[in-house]
Amino acid sequence: MAVRALRGAIQVDANDRDLILEGIRELITELFDRNDMSADDVISMIFTATPDLTAEFPAYAARRLGFDDVPLLCAVEIDVAGAMPRVLRVLAHVETPKTRAELHHSYLRGAAALRRDLPA
């Protein structure tokens, strides 16, 4: 087993608690389904939110998905002029036998524009 990192992001429509919870649910579900992984494979997850998203902690949404005993951390993404607004990001550290080349990162909705180099 190796320690690997999975990345993902999603853009939500507004600073709304329900939209943040739904966005994280969609992002985490897609990321872990695409990589055939579960909470048992996760070492830790770091979430960031752009400064315009303050209605809920992204980690709270992950807890609701069953990541109860996984160390989770939230932070604010740096406020760069012209950066895409309303984006939630995740960096998940996982244990897996897969190589880096076998991992699939997930950039959803408008956030897909952040990584045009990745396959859909």
Regions found by a protein language model. Give the residues of each.
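Terminal domain-initiation and capping elements
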Residues: 1-120
